[in-house]
Design a protein with these regions (language model features):
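Charged, terminal alpha-helix-loop-beta segments
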Residues: 1-158
Length: 158
């Protein structure tokens, strides 16, 4: 099932080495901005979710066989959660990428009895992605929404 998580964009600007794509007012400009926000707010995804950390390596851009997992986390039961981010629309091809990462973590990182599951977070989940994940019980889909609230600090009255 798709779950909605409402987030607020933080005010700090991050330097990234990506070209900006045209952005709607309700999405992050860069995947790294979404990643940084979620790393600081993993509880929005699931209570008890923590960033993976071991031997000085954390779960941000976690290396897996020459590629990188956007966020590797551990849930409240101690199981791994592989999180793949798409700043705009999530298409079905992301499923293969996520399954490859899940298989790598199962093979290289897990202890006996430890499970691995995946989460895809995108601004918009395509119908093809919904269909592709419909029989995969180990993958959850989330759509994110941004909101911005303004608070008057001082009025400029005459």
């Amino acid at each position: 099932p798709i779950q909605n998580a409402t987030t607020e964009k933080h005010s700090e600007r991050l330097e990234v080495e990506e070209e900006a794509e045209p952005v709607g007012m309700s999405e992050f400009a860069y995947e790294r901005d979404l990643q940084n926000y979620l790393v600081k707010n993993l509880e929005l995804i699931e209570p008890g979710l923590k960033l993976y950390e071991d031997d000085g390596i954390n779960g941000i851009e976690f290396p897996v066989g020459g590629r990188f997992i956007d966020i590797l986390a551990v849930d409240s039961k101690g199981d791994f959660v592989v999180i793949e981010l798409k700043v705009a629309r999530g298409y079905d091809r992301v499923v293969g990428q996520l399954l490859r990462y899940i298989a790598w973590i199962k093979k290289e990182q897990t202890d006996p009895g430890q499970n691995v599951r995946g989460i895809i977070i995108a601004r918009d989940i395509s119908e093809d992605l919904l269909l592709a994940c419909s029989s995969l019980t180990s993958i959850e889909l989330f759509e994110y929404e941004l909101s911005l609230a303004l608070k008057l600090v001082q009025s400029c009255e005459d």
